[in-house]
A protein has these predicted regions:
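N-terminal alpha-helical targeting/anchoring segments
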Residues: 1-55, 73, 77
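TRNA-recognition modules of translation machinery and tRNA-sensing kinases, especially anticodon-binding
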Residues: 51-183
Length: 183
């Protein structure tokens, strides 16, 4: 073949090898920081801080679903009707409690020096790959194929991608961001 055909063949081979390399690299997990304790289950988690007095409720403690029903805070049946299992509808005081808790935690983060963001609820595939969501969780993420956008699982995905591709200086760290999304 001609030199042009040979170059074209080698270009295609290089693209294929580069894609194989990227696919392999995307399967490698991120290493946790050395300060992160190692464990096999949630029992191995380390409590970092506790606040306030914990009342001893003894046998009078009720599970959250009973409290939600008793005080009409969450309508599980409406959630099933609208979206299916696992999508509760917060109503009345339950909706107010949800909003108050969100505000409480955002205010705490702000007081600790975190910058608050309201990020988009969908991201492109590069953003999904940038946080390890893709390809690992591809089948578990809602995907709008028309726009090739993915529904985020947490605010972490878009917030982390604010710095995707940037070279950060050690003097600029840590970068403290927070955000709330209903995702």
């Amino acid at each position: 073949g001609s030199l042009k055909e040979r170059i074209q063949t080698l270009d295609e081979k290089q693209k294929s090898l580069m894609q194989q390399q990227e696919d392999t690299l995307l399967e490698l997990p991120n290493r946790p920081h050395d300060s992160v304790p190692s464990g096999q289950s949630e029992e191995d988690n380390e409590v970092v801080a506790e606040e306030g007095d914990k009342p001893d409720l003894g046998n009078s403690a009720k599970p959250h679903w009973d409290l939600a029903d008793q005080y009409k805070l969450i309508d599980f049946e409406a959630g099933v009707k609208i979206s299916g299992a696992g999508f509760p509808v917060y109503r009345g005081k339950g909706a107010k409690l949800q909003r108050a808790l969100i505000q409480f935690f955002l205010d705490r983060a702000d007081a600790a020096g975190y910058e608050e963001f309201i990020p988009p609820h969908v991201v492109n595939a590069d953003s999904g790959r940038g946080t390890g969501q893709l390809p690992d969780k591809e089948g578990q993420m809602y995907h709008c194929t028309e726009d090739d956008l993915y529904l985020i699982p947490t605010a972490e995905v878009p917030l982390t991608n604010l710095y995707r591709g940037d070279l950060l200086k050690a003097d600029d760290l840590p970068i403290q961001l927070c955000g709330y999304t209903p995702c």
